[in-house]
């Protein structure tokens, strides 16, 4: 063990400028174990003040925590010491693993909060410090946020890949190729009297940027796959009144989400349910029944139903098996006829669509399997591409547009260099090295306090 007096702040560059922050790093409420994380120049001091000593780095050690104000024992806990820069934030960090009772946590947090230049952390502040200290880049931070929010197996896999730097590494490889091409162009600017790019330089630049442009286009071609995995596949249930839309929603959700009634017009607004369908996140939306003689309020719901249907990845068009209704035209890219209340009629033959009964469960499993297969084609779980957010897609589009100009247009060497510079900057923005504070604030606001 290391005596507390020997534990000086390892991150001395931050000691004079940064406050020390603390926060629970585990969930709210009572639990067997709770964790409080501390980061900043006073982390070692706080560890010594409460535990009486500073343990060996990165080794869990049993200690009795005392309130420095009155010396009263707070809890028997495991404490850990992470001297910077070898820590999550890059600063001196400490962790207190205590019993998860509310009184224990309240006592520990109160004791920490009484020290000067020590304050509770803001949402995402630990991760923000990791970003500022170069421990993570912005794409990895986004992957970490997605990992915390992941609810399905596909989301977990994609988030882990992002968190481990898949996008960052690939973007940097592309950027290095563009920087090499840029150096060739700038050499021509510095050492040539010609206004246009010499043929030899043009060929060498093209050899560097054409593979990058091809890769960017390939990623943009499957851009929606990654976003679907992260945000969820949009499936909208539509059809005439009393077709069983709300009953199907409740059956797939396995709980009473929507009111089911024989009275037409019961559902007047959109009702959304988030589901885990065989590892794929799905946003299932129930809509108002479509009919001509609707009142004004119901008409608003019908208009919203059409709008959501046109935006959906998949529309399930429901109508009764005894009285099938064809779906309207231009409803969406993918529309499946689904015939409901099929347990009341003879088996349907020679009819395109799937016959089910949401009440009895007849063929409901087939519908789920069909949706899962459809989701797998839209968003393959093995490799969904690097793009998981609109921000990524926009950066790829800016880079691709600039490189396309480089190849298609016989521009003066100065314009060629500028387009190469724009493409490289677009790729650099993926890792956050030139991002604005506004974008950072939006991302970190979604983090929990202790992260």
Swiss-Prot record:
Binds 1 potassium ion per subunit. It comes from the Bacteria. GTP binds at residues 242-247, 261-267, 286-289. (6S)-5-formyl-5,6,7,8-tetrahydrofolate binds at residues 37, 95, 135, 451. The keyword Transport does not apply. Its cofactor is K(+). It is found in: Cytoplasm. One of its GO terms (cellular component) is cytoplasm. InterPro entries: AAA+_ATPase, G_TrmE, GTP-bd, GTP-bd_TrmE_N, GTPase_MnmE, MnmE_dom2, MnmE_helical, P-loop_NTPase. Mg(2+) binds at residues 246, 267. It holds the Pfam family TrmE_N. Belongs to the TRAFAC class TrmE-Era-EngA-EngB-Septin-like GTPase superfamily. TrmE GTPase family. Homodimer. Heterotetramer of two MnmE and two MnmG subunits. Exhibits a very high intrinsic GTPase hydrolysis rate. Involved in the addition of a carboxymethylaminomethyl (cmnm) group at the wobble position (U34) of certain tRNAs, forming tRNA-cmnm(5)s(2)U34. This is tRNA modification GTPase MnmE. It comes from Beijerinckia indica subsp. indica (strain ATCC 9039 / DSM 1715 / NCIMB 8712).
